[in-house]
């Protein structure tokens, strides 16, 4: 097994075994959705979004493709496509980063501190610089239209009463039912297939310098 393949399985397993709700697409570890909650103490705090993640064959040497599925109002996120303009993913990516870094640090950081000088949404960038109050009102308007818990439930299904992780930083206490199946909307740590894969990966050394050098030089 190549080091990229091992790293994909290891990083996705870490995400699956975390508190985040993950939905593999066609049982593939290279394409999946992640439920993302807006960071606390920001205008995005009450929003719930679905992230679409694709991992390239040569991950982690090439960065993943990540976008928002339901709409969000932000200077660095395209309203129509959900594409994210984030240097740490697009241009300064390092193999040292992993999926947990992206979900718990990089994207929350972008929502907390937008970069108005490199916008994908010009309206949001202009409001952020010139009218902070209207900017925050617009964010909340988009949350009400596209990203409340109820809207998320209607669009994507899932257990609306389950205790979710706080993607914006502090993780909430794990739901007592987290080991049960999520009926196709996520993968729990109690899933037999996940447990088997976890055992298979227990001996993997993701810091195998020889494997990393071999792939990096290809």
Curated annotation (Swiss-Prot):
The UniProt entry, under SUPFAM superfamilies, shows: UBC-like
User: What is this protein for, i.e. what is its function?
Assistant: Catalyzes the covalent attachment of ubiquitin to other proteins. Required for the adaptation to the presence of glucose in the growth medium; mediates the degradation of enzymes involved in gluconeogenesis when cells are shifted to glucose-containing medium. Required for proteasome-dependent catabolite degradation of fructose-1,6-bisphosphatase (FBP1).
UniProt feature coiled coil, ranges: none
Cross-referenced CDD domains: UBCc_UBE2H (cd23797)
List, for all copies, the residue spans of the domain called UBC core.
Answer: 3-148
Name under which the protein is recorded: Ubiquitin-conjugating enzyme E2-24 kDa
Q: Which UniProt keywords apply?
A: ATP-binding, Cytoplasm, Nucleotide-binding, Transferase, Ubl conjugation pathway
Something else known: Present with 1590 molecules/cell in log phase SD medium.
UniProt cross-references to InterPro entries, sorted A to Z: UBQ-conjugat_E2_core (IPR000608), UBQ-conjugating_AS (IPR023313), UBQ-conjugating_enzyme/RWD (IPR016135)
Matching Pfam families: UQ_con
Q: In which pathway does it act?
A: Protein modification; protein ubiquitination
Q: Where does this protein come from, organism-wise?
A: Saccharomyces cerevisiae (strain ATCC 204508 / S288c) (Baker's yeast)
Its primary localisation, in coarse terms, equals cytoplasm
Enzyme Commission code(s) on record: 2.3.2.23
State the family named in the UniProt similarity comment for this chain. Answer: Belongs to the ubiquitin-conjugating enzyme family.
- Single annotated GO MF: ubiquitin-protein transferase activity
């Amino acid at each position: 097994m190549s080091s990229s393949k091992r790293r994909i399985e290891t990083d996705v397993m870490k995400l699956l075994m975390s508190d985040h709700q993950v939905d593999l697409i066609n049982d593939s570890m290279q394409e999946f959705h992640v439920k993302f909650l807006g960071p606390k103490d920001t205008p995005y705090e009450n929003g719930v979004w679905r992230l679409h993640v694709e991992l390239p064959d040569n991950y982690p040497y090439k960065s993943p493709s990540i976008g928002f599925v339901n709409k969000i109002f932000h200077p660095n996120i395209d309203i129509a496509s959900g594409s994210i303009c984030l240097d740490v993913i697009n241009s300064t990516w390092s193999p040292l980063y992993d999926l947990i870094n992206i979900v718990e640090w990089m994207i929350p950081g972008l929502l907390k501190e937008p970069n108005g000088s490199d916008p994908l949404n010009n309206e949001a960038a202009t409001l952020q610089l010139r009218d902070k109050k209207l900017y925050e009102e617009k964010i909340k308007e988009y949350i009400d239209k596209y990203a409340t818990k109820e809207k998320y439930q209607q669009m994507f299904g899932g257990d609306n009463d389950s205790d979710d992780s706080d993607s914006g930083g502090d993780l909430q206490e794990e739901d007592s039912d987290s080991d049960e199946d999520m009926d196709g909307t996520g993968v729990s740590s109690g899933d037999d297939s996940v447990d088997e894969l976890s055992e298979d990966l227990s001996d993997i050394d993701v810091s195998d310098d020889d494997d990393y050098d071999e792939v990096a030089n290809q």
